[in-house]
Amino acid sequence: MIIERLVGNLRDLNPLDFNVDHVDLEWFETRKKIARFKTRQGKDIAIRLKDAPKLGLSQGDILFKEEKEIIAVNILDSEVIHIQAKSVAEVAKICYEIGNRHAALYYGESQFEFKTPFEKPTLALLEKLGVQNRVLSSKLDSKERLTVSMPHSEPNFKVSLASDFKVVVK
């Protein structure tokens, strides 16, 4: 089965009305536009998204829906660093340092809380900076992602020069 577009999200439906099969993905697999996976029920699926979400697949995204059958995304828990900032200045410092490492950064559950995938050098840096943190198991859902850059990706838009010499993004 080849999936070329998303159909919706489970949060917009009552999952009890459907037979839901899940594709379990690691957080870093949610940004793939082309991939092969096996569902929990053993179905082989190929993803070739034409208009992939800029942030990636999110928890509950529906890849396939036909009558009462649904195949949806489940993002697996992974080891993450939960970061708790004490001030706006510390938020700026955290965002700068994490961004400087080109690491993924996600919103946390509360104000001034962030999450990033666990890496020992990042943990050591946060300790050195005196930033409050703890290592926990958590989902890194693309809809909570702060950073949108994708290495080695092609833009999803066309840039052209208009007759009045203005740059037009379509």
Swiss-Prot record:
Superkingdom of origin: Bacteria
Alphabetical keyword list: Chaperone, Cytoplasm, Nickel, Nickel insertion
GO CC annotations, alphabetized: cytoplasm
InterPro entries cross-referenced by the UniProt entry: UreE, UreE_C_dom, UreE_N, UreE_N_sf
Pfam families registered for this protein in UniProt: UreE_C, UreE_N
Molecular-function GO terms, alphabetical: nickel cation binding; unfolded protein binding
Gene Ontology biological-process annotations: protein folding; protein-containing complex assembly; urea metabolic process
Compartments (UniProt record): Cytoplasm
Functional note: Involved in urease metallocenter assembly. Binds nickel. Probably functions as a nickel donor during metallocenter assembly.
UniProt-listed HAMAP family: UreE (MF_00822)
Family membership noted in the UniProt record: Belongs to the UreE family.
This protein's name: Urease accessory protein UreE
Species for this entry: Helicobacter pylori (strain J99 / ATCC 700824)
